[in-house]
Every structure is written in structure tokens, then in C-alpha cells.
Amino acid sequence: MACAPGALGHRALWAVAWGLLLLVPVLAGAQRGRKKVVHVLEGESGSVVVQTAPGQVVSHRGGTIVLPCRYHYEAAAHGHDGVRLKWTKVVDPLAFADVFVALGPQHRAFGPYRGRAELQNDGPGDASLVLRNVTLQDYGRYECEVTNELEDDVGMVKLDLEGVVFPYHPRGGRYKMTFVEAQRACAEQDGILASAEQLHAAWRDGLDWCNAGWLRDGSVQYPVSHAREPCGGTGSTGAGGGTNGGVRNYGYRHNAEERYDAFCFTSNLPGRVFFLKPLRPVALAGAVRACAARGATVAKVGQLFAAWKLQLLDRCTAGWLADGSARYPIVNPRTRCGGPRPGVRSLGFPDASRRLFGVYCYRAPGAPDPAPGGWGWGWAGGGGWAGGSRDPAAWTPLRV
């Protein structure tokens, strides 16, 4: 039976309407798949919706980054001046640190964020936070909370940093550090304890290390790219799946009694690392004086790793570092420089009184230039560094 044109039109409209109603949840799910969106619905008016998209942003030490956060609600029911914006950092699963709070014209940053954090203020509904001079300690997850009277909503943003993970143990030997001592050791070498995510990313990038170390969450793990018996065996399954390698995990350990090495993380250098080549080998004390005479300090382990990874420092000569170890960075592997893989080679911790090596120095930005008038460094003897204009070829600063 043929339908009347009018009836067909009404049925077509109802079909389209039902199709749209069914399509809305699908579109909403797709939208949530693209960005972090948290919804709290409080009726037809006054609903607060917070969006933090993208859910992860990447910066580097010394950089400036925007932690995105936008909110929307019925402005007719509430004015924007009554909205409180609060940023916090997740320091533990159930612990938070205040970062920034704003209520109308009143703004306040807290602790280490003072002078570095401010709202972006890109129009109504923008709660994004601008963070300047990013530090290693800024790495982590942040919550953006928007509160209006009894209504609130929260979005999450993760701040990641470009950098490098490096294994570390002090002169005392392997497996000597508690969790707190590992934190301190990383800080002394211009780093922080790496996160499990950072260690996993380093493993995917080829990090292979057969000694277990503390991570920032209190777990103990180690990355194995090439499975072998001394490193968990050839049949162990790590975080990467399969039996050919992975991140071996000892789980969460007693942080005051058990002792391991550390996996540290560091990021971009604000200054530069360079190598000073002596006329004759020097002891560690002489290396310290040589760097000081060049307006620099002896480089830390993390600074050398950052110069190798991020500034491509390549030098096939061992040099003293601040912790008393001797190392050298290789970007382009060659046989005479430690084997077929790039990395920072370590010669361990030689006797500091022995005259064996040159030195890797670190010069911070804005450090005063050495006194003009020759190549002298203000000290004589004690290592035989070239002085004056007598032998300018006897030292080699490598700028990166």
C-alpha cells in the first residue's frame, strides 16, 4: 500500500531524530577518546564541564609550557567572578601539593611555583596554567579543579619532560643505597629518580642495564634489552612482553632497609659541558682547579649524560667528573672507543690522587668569562696544564 506524501515526511523526520539521538553517545565517546573530558551534571543550569586537552604535554628543563584546562557552565546562573580555579600536583596516589589558586581577581602561586606560574587568561572559561622555567621537579601529573558554589569538576594533565635516564651508584659500590639515599644521589648528580614510565621509555630506546635500581614510586626495576642468564635469564618475561628482554620488576621494596642502585632522570642543560685536555694527566683536585679557572665547575654525571643525549657530545677521552668517577660520551660508536653501541662509558671510580685523566667541565649560563690575557688558569704545577700563550694547543674545550 502506498503511503501518503505527508505521512512519509513525518516518518522520515522521526527516523532522522532517532538516528541523531542514537548517534550522540557514539560521538561523545569518540570525543572522549581524543581528549580527557570529565563531566559533572547538576541539572539543566549551572552544569560544570572541565576539559583538559591534550591530556599530556611535553617540555624540557628551562622551558615554558601551558597546562591546558577549559571549563564551561551556564553563565546566566552564575557569574565568572564566583568561580574558583585551583591547580594541584599529584605527589602520591592520595597526596597533593598546591600549585596555584585563583578566585576572581585574587591569584596566588605556592612554594616553588611562585614567580613561575600564572593563568593564561585566554578568554572566558580558560583555566590553563602557564608554567615558566620548567624544572626537573615539575615532572608529573596535575589536577585542574573548577568550583562554583556546590558544583565542581576536575581534569588531569600530565607534564612530561624530554631527557635521559641513567643508572647510578656512588663510589661505595653497587646495591648500597636506601630509597632516600638514592633520591639524594640523583639530586647530587643533577637529576631526580626516574619514573617507571621514563625507565620503560628508555628501555624501548635501547637502555640495557643488569643492576636493579630504585624508581621514584619506590619500586625496584631494571631494563634488559638483550636477555642473558645473569640478568633474569633468557626465559623471563619483562614489561615488554616476550622472552627476549623487558623491564624486570622486583615490585615495591622496603625503602629504609633494602639497598639498590638508582635510575636517575635529567633533562636539557641550561649551560654547556666541555672537555679540558691536559698537557699531562692530572689528579681530581687539579681537575677541579682547572675548571674553576675557566669559569666552570667539574661536570656532574647527569650533566654529562644530558650533553651526550641532547647535545650530542662525543669524545673518546676519559675525564674526571664531580663524583670522582671517570667517564666519556660516545655518540658515534667506534672500535677503539668502547664497542659498537653509543652511550656514556664508565671507568669506575679511580683513586682521586692518581694523575690519569682530563676533566669534563660544566659552565652555567651567565658565568663570568675567565680573566683575559693568555691561557693561564691562576695556578702552577700540580698537573702540568698548559699556561699562557706557550702552548694553546695543549687543551681542547669542546663546545656543544
Curated annotation (Swiss-Prot):
Compartments, as annotated in UniProt: Secreted, Extracellular space, Extracellular matrix
Glycosylation positions in this chain: 133
Gene3D superfamilies referenced in this protein's UniProt entry, alphabetically: Immunoglobulins, Mannose-Binding Protein A, subunit A
Disulfide bond annotation, renumbered to this chain: 69-144, 186-264, 210-231, 291-361, 316-337
Ranges of residues in domain Ig-like C2-type: 47-155
The Link domain, residue ranges: 164-266, 271-363
Reported consequences of knocking out the gene: In deep cerebellar nuclei (DCN) neurons of knockout mice, inhibitory synaptic strengths are reduced as compared to those in wild-type mice, whereas the properties of excitatory synapses are unaffected. A reduction in GABAergic pre-synaptic terminals of Purkinje cells are seen in the DCN neurons. Mice show significantly attenuated perineuronal nets formation in the DCN, a marked decrease of brevican (BCAN) in the brainstem and cerebellum and a reduction in synapse number in the DCN neurons.
Taxonomic superkingdom: Eukaryota
Signal peptide: 1-30
An example Gene Ontology CC term for this record: extracellular region
Single biological process term from Gene Ontology: synaptic transmission, GABAergic
Keyword annotations: Disulfide bond, Extracellular matrix, Glycoprotein, Hyaluronic acid, Immunoglobulin domain, Repeat, Secreted, Signal
Free-text tissue specificity from the UniProt record: Expressed predominantly in brain where it is found mainly throughout the midbrain and hindbrain in a perineuronal net pattern.
Short name of one Pfam family: V-set
An example molecular function term from Gene Ontology annotations: structural constituent of synapse-associated extracellular matrix
Biological role stated in the UniProt entry: Essential for the proper localization of brevican (BCAN), mainly as a perineuronal nets (PNNs)-type deposition in the brainstem and cerebellum thereby playing a key role in the formation and structural organization of PNNs. Contributes to the formation and transmission of inhibitory GABAergic synapses between Purkinje cells and deep cerebellar nuclei neurons.
Family per similarity comment: Belongs to the HAPLN family.
Entry protein name: Hyaluronan and proteoglycan link protein 4
Species of provenance: Mus musculus (Mouse)
Recorded name of the encoding gene: Hapln4
